[in-house]
Amino acid sequence: MEKKYILALDQGTTSSRAMIIDEEGEVIGVAQEEFDQIFPKPGWVEHSANEIWASILAVIAGVLLKTNISSKEIAGIGITNQRETTVIWDKESGNPIYNAIVWQSRQTEDICKQLRKDGYEDTIRSKTGLLIDPYFAGTKARWILDHVDGAQERAEKGELLFGTIDTWLVWKLTGGRAHITDYSNASRTLLYNIYDLEWDDELLKMLNIPRAMLPEVRPSSEVYADTVPYHFFGEEVPVAGIAGDQQAALFGQGCFEKGMAKNTYGTGCFLLMNTGEKAVRSENGLLTTLAWGLDGKVEYALEGSIFVAGSAIQWLRDGLRMVRQSSDSENYASRIESSDGVYVVPAFVGLGAPYWDSDVRGAVFGLTRGTEKEQFIRATLESLAYQTRDVLYAMEQDSGISLKTLRVDGGASANNFLMQFQSDILGVPVERPENKETTVLGAAFLAGLAVGVWKDKNEIKKHWKLDKRFEVEMKDDQREDLYEGWHKAVKAAQAFK
């Protein structure tokens, strides 16, 4: 039986999904399963690693049954995952010693404060490209070792293993034969030197993490190990591709050349720009990260995150009840020619890159007696585009690369008004692909390259199909006037603390 399909596993923050992708890069089947969010204290977020594993087994079985495809036809498996979420488990039994601590969780704030106090900020920045923040995996591992009796001792003896979600899933799928991660996930731990491409002794000492518990770091596309037959109806299937979700989306968008960038409009926004084989150190509050390792070399990216994007549209719907469903926002915004000087700064949880101001809160400016809900809705949508320009401007400043086009995906990329305004306020075209499942496609493409479903990146590029290209329609002076108004609004919001 010909092996012509790739199984892509997308292990996300609220659900796990499995998709089967054919040689043309088309998704031919999907299965999805949600799992519980655990909130032990305010600001803490955890998952049961065993429940995540059970959800992965369920979606694999579900998608194979739904599509009537035999596991004998699967050429390889690609994995993409919520980044930074951390698991520590017993090497012998395979049981986690504590819940997985999720990327959103703030429970390691005290550890981060101590690192700052001890003056580690520059060291971490210069070796990892990251900031000291509870977001990243290293402090989560330290927290678990501190809070589970005997864990530090057992880790030093080599009895415990550490991993991000990709590592945990590969370990389980292969029956413990492979304890690995890829470059993209390793670069989110605070423990990995992204320049020397190795676990860094100084960083390990800083957080007192025993080297014995760390996974081997491998390229993002190669055959790592085969699954154990009992997970796949009697088949051994190669696990052949891994990338963290945002890097996978960059790959799935075909952003293979230096200077290509994508924006994922989800609850927040994640912008990544490929900077090629050279790491760019940011002077503007962006993260430097590994994009992927492929063909014997690594490529780097600049990353900026916007905290509030799609959630601002949900706020219009659920908080203010201005729209019945999120998609109505496009209709309201398109009814008027402009937002008439109204600016919404959606800093509900502070502002991310490039401001990094956690104390600022949301604000609205420019209201008059004539302001109606159309202006308010339009201004809210426009705020997503302004924030995107802020980040992309910082990327251009850091990299010295001028953006030619922006590729987009995620829920809010379906909003035609927003995409047109995004193009106008950036002054570059915006391209939306037909297949918006770019994260899953990225994982599938990485696996498919390793097992020979696709020959090279040039062949993959052909499977990226354009849905719509939004060309710039706004005049330069109008663009700069609007953008200047946005900056005034942000400054005013920051003054009100």
UniProtKB/Swiss-Prot annotation:
Residues reported to bind ADP: 13, 17, 267, 310, 411, 415
Domain of life: Bacteria
UniProt GO MF annotations: ATP binding; glycerol kinase activity
Positions contributing to glycerol binding: 83-84, 135, 245-246
UniProt entry keywords in alphabetical sequence: ATP-binding, Glycerol metabolism, Kinase, Nucleotide-binding, Phosphoprotein, Transferase
Residue numbers of Phosphohistidine PTMs: 231
Inhibition and activation profile: Activated by phosphorylation and inhibited by fructose 1,6-bisphosphate (FBP).
EC numbers on record: 2.7.1.30
InterPro entries named in the record: ATPase_NBD, Carb_kinase_FGGY, Carb_kinase_FGGY_CS, FGGY_C, FGGY_N, Glycerol_kin
SUPFAM superfamilies attached to this UniProt entry: Actin-like ATPase domain (SSF53067)
Binding site for ATP: 13-15, 267, 310, 314, 411
Substrates-to-products reaction catalysed: glycerol + ATP = sn-glycerol 3-phosphate + ADP + H(+)
Post-translational modification: The phosphoenolpyruvate-dependent sugar phosphotransferase system (PTS), including enzyme I, and histidine-containing protein (HPr) are required for the phosphorylation, which leads to the activation of the enzyme.
Subunit text: Homotetramer and homodimer (in equilibrium).
Similarity field: Belongs to the FGGY kinase family.
Function: Key enzyme in the regulation of glycerol uptake and metabolism. Catalyzes the phosphorylation of glycerol to yield sn-glycerol 3-phosphate.
Protein name: Glycerol kinase
Species whose genome carries this gene: Listeria innocua serovar 6a (strain ATCC BAA-680 / CLIP 11262)
